[in-house]
C-alpha cells in the first residue's frame, strides 16, 4: 500500500519519531518508530509485507506501534514535543536542547 507523509514530530525524550501518513483514499495512520530514520512531509512510503520503501528506496524502520489517526491524539503528540525547534519548522543552526536530547542523529542539523 502507498502512503504520503503528512507530518513528523521528533520525540527528543524517547529517541523516536511520530509520523502522520495518509493513503490515496485519505485513510490516516500514526507511526511511532525509532529515530534511526526521519520521514519528511511529502515523502512517499510503500509498505509491502515486511518491506518498506521511502521514495522508492528500501529502508529499515523499527516500528514500535501503528495507530489509526485521531486528531486529538496527534495534537497531544505535537504539543508534548515543543522543545525541539525542528518540530516547528524553524531553522536549527545550533540546538539549545542538545544536552538533554536523546536523539543520536538530529534530522534538522547538517552533519
Curated annotation (Swiss-Prot):
Family statement drawn from the similarity comment of this UniProt entry = Belongs to the IraM/RssC family.
Keyword Cytoplasm assigned to the entry: answer is yes
Query: Which named protein is this?
Result: Anti-adapter protein IraM
| Protein localization | Cytoplasm
- UniProt-listed NCBIfam families: PRK09919.1
This protein's UniProt keywords: Cytoplasm, Stress response
Q: What is its main location?
A: cytoplasm
Amino acid at each position: 500500500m502507498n502512503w504520503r507523509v503528512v507530518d513528523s514530530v521528533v520525540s527528543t525524550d524517547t529517541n523516536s519519531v511520530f509520523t502522520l501518513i495518509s493513503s490515496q483514499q485519505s485513510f490516516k495512520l500514526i507511526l511511532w518508530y525509532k529515530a534511526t530514520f526521519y520521514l519528511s512531509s511529502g515523502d512517499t512510503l510503500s509498505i509491502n509485507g515486511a518491506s518498506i520503501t521511502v521514495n522508492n528506496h528500501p529502508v529499515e524502520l523499527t516500528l514500535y506501534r501503528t495507530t489509526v489517526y485521531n486528531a486529538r491524539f496527534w495534537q497531544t503528540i505535537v504539543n508534548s514535543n515543543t522543545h525541539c525547534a525542528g518540530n516547528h519548522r524553524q531553522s536549527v543552526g545550533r540546538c539549545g536542547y542538545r544536552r538533554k536530547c536523546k536523539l543520536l542523529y538530529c534530522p534538522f542539523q547538517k552533519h
